[in-house]
Amino acid sequence: MINKAILGGTFDPIHNAHINVAYEALERFNLEEVIFIPAGNPPHKIKLKKTPAHIRYEMVKLAIEKETRFSISDFEIKSKGLSYTYRTLKHFKEKEPETNWYFITGEDCLSYLEHWKYIDEIFNICNFVIFSREGFKEKEEIIKKKKSILLKYGKEILFMDASILDISSTKIRNRIKEGKEVSFYMPDKVYKFILQNNLYK
């Protein structure tokens, strides 16, 4: 069976940590492909100001262009309404029903995971992978959440210690506003694109 993963995010901007997570997942889960999906209108970020979708899409495209096992989808940014994870996963599962799908997201999602729309269906569609920037310690809250989800949905959440730098898109945007150097946080073409388009000033 073919294994593929979906890595969704606002990618505002995409940075080296996103890329490293994708590479880590390729090896860990024997993936044929990681599909980057720039978020359209995520329900938990409705009020947050975002860079236009076509610009975020272009930055992701530039960041991954040299890796044949990475691809990009405009499914969410072209879809109308709120960008629910369930709708995205359902789309790809219907497109490739024989594929074994993984969905990769950050540790911060754990706290409200059970409140996601159609979370029970999401668990039926894919393997849920949580990654941490700092590496997973057996924190009490994580152990409780793992047990809770296993009991409620009969599904095991997969955890991935991603060897990544302490980088966030928010940190990058703030550093640019402050006139600080950010080139080492992202692929060179993304950095040049940000400069050329005067983003995040």
Curated annotation (Swiss-Prot):
Q: What is catalyzed by this enzyme?
A: nicotinate beta-D-ribonucleotide + ATP + H(+) = deamido-NAD(+) + diphosphate
GO MF annotations, alphabetized: ATP binding; nicotinate-nucleotide adenylyltransferase activity
Q: Which CDD domains match?
A: NMNAT
- Pfam families in the record, alphabetically? CTP_transf_like
- Regions crossing the membrane: none
EC assignment: 2.7.7.18
What gene, per UniProt, encodes this protein? nadD
Which pathway, per its entry?
Cofactor biosynthesis; NAD(+) biosynthesis; deamido-NAD(+) from nicotinate D-ribonucleotide: step 1/1
Q: Which residues form a coiled coil?
A: none
Sorted UniProt keywords: ATP-binding, NAD, Nucleotide-binding, Nucleotidyltransferase, Pyridine nucleotide biosynthesis, Transferase
Q: Which SUPFAM superfamilies match?
A: Nucleotidylyl transferase
Protein role: Catalyzes the reversible adenylation of nicotinate mononucleotide (NaMN) to nicotinic acid adenine dinucleotide (NaAD).
The UniProt entry, under Gene3D superfamilies, shows: HUPs
Q: Tell me, what is an example of a GO biological process annotation in this record?
A: NAD biosynthetic process
Tell me the protein family, please. Answer: Belongs to the NadD family.
Question: Can you name this protein?
Answer: Probable nicotinate-nucleotide adenylyltransferase
Classification via InterPro entries: Cyt_trans-like, NadD/NMNAT, Rossmann-like_a/b/a_fold
Claim: NAD is one of the keywords in the record: yes
